[in-house]
Amino acid sequence: MSESKIVLNAVFGVKAGMTRIFDENGNHIPVTVIKIIPNLITQVKTDAKDGYNAYQVGFGEKREALLNKPNKGILAKAGVSQNVTHFAEIKSDAVDAANLGKEIDFEVFTPGAYVDVTGESKGKGFAGVMKRYNFQGGPAAHGSHFHRRPGSIGCRATPARVFRNKKMPGHLGVETSTVQNIQVVEVNLEAGYMLIKGSIPGSKNGFVKIMKSVKKA
């Protein structure tokens, strides 16, 4: 690892899509391809000043004309020349102001390690309760007029209202979702990609957060 890079317990990448690879026995393994992108330290949050220790990370890239003035100031102070599109924080037990402007190293994730991956689930538009919440639905045979409806949503004269967060039809997807305990199959820093076994949330070209597994060491 070079002096211009640091190691944290999480990184951000781009979901490129899915494919499959074959092991030495000829068994196919479904994998998700994650594009490795620069993760740059743009701010250092300290317990004394901010109440907690964390690094603000900038990733993604866009034209300079699309950057607003506050973000330009943050990047200039950090000495970051890349016009990043997204900012996020990664908490750390200890932080060092000398790491400002450095890049996070992907080498912390090795083949065989277990990770948790967070992304934004695909949007599926307006959906009914059977698709959205896996409701059973009504009878499908003849004579029934009740097939895919949610059924009664009320109660009685008391409380005479529908409770908050009642499961009803509505927008499905576009929610932060995390899959846990999935295995890193390959990390190729030269080619700029890593392979993770199985599927992860989100659509192609969406940003994902890869973290060391909480439940598995």
Model-derived segments and spans:
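Extended basic (Lys/Arg/His-rich) segments that typically form rRNA-contacting surfaces
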Residues: 1-217
